[in-house]
Amino acid sequence: MFKKFKPVTPGTRQLVLPAFDELTTQGELSGKKTRKSVRPNKKLSFFKKSSGGRDNLGHISCRHRGGGAKRLYRVIDFKRNKDGIEAKVVSVEYDPNRSAYIALLSYADGEKRYILAPKGIKRGDQVISGEGSPFKLGCCMTLKSMPLGSTVHNIEMRPHSGGKLVRSAGLAAQVIAKTPGYVTLKMPSGEFRMLNEGCRATIGEVSNSDHNLCVDGKAGRKRWKGIRPTVRGTAMNPVDHPHGGGEGRHNGYIPRTPWGKVTKGLKTRDKRKSNKWIVKDRRK
């Protein structure tokens, strides 16, 4: 769900924000009448200094980054390797470091961990990991244990490496086929990809599926997120960009990147390098 705002100011005219209806409030945990969001678990969060888009030498390696509000990083369990122990969902929380929501699990032995929250998971639900787990929302198991047509997310690329694929808000992959040793998945991009049958994945779709419908409404909200302005090459000087300079506007050049490479349509992929694990390319 998302909410729109009355156009009281120019910044709220186009503004569309998530409603956060799926998130657990402090009132639900304490029994008091309050809509405040749940504070992150202290043992599973720490302050992470922003790089500002700079590498270890101080050079800009990623443009348009810098500033923004400080963030606490939440430690997420992407491996889901605590097998055979039931866990109860304590809360579904907001995470500023990713587009999806996260869920705090409390295991039967007392340990707590954060996981990516699947769409539809609620406070009080039970989940479990490992072989023999029930085919239920939020449970984690190997791909060979999943029936054909299953919807999965947080998928490993190699066994025991931790989930790498399909982790953004609203995404899901589908189990299409099984062969000896491998499972074929249809990825959100449309690509068909083979993975080792021992790779783990979590059942369900990633939460916050309306994330792509949100509109920031003003430049200031982008700055709060740590996103800086993108300047056009034609507005720069010749020293700064291949499109820079000139008396007025001129269009006598092939569009290029800031580093001089031809852009818009130039194929840069080596045809000789193929990936045997990709059954069907998303570009074809």
UniProtKB/Swiss-Prot annotation:
Keyword RNA-binding: yes
Record GO cellular component, one term: large ribosomal subunit
Keywords: Ribonucleoprotein, Ribosomal protein, RNA-binding, rRNA-binding
Domain of life: Bacteria
Matches recorded under NCBIfam families: rplB_bact
HAMAP family referenced in this protein's UniProt entry, alphabetically: Ribosomal_uL2_B (MF_01320_B)
Entry similarity comment: Belongs to the universal ribosomal protein uL2 family.
Record protein name field: Large ribosomal subunit protein uL2
Organism: Chlamydia abortus (strain DSM 27085 / S26/3)
Gene giving rise to this polypeptide: rplB
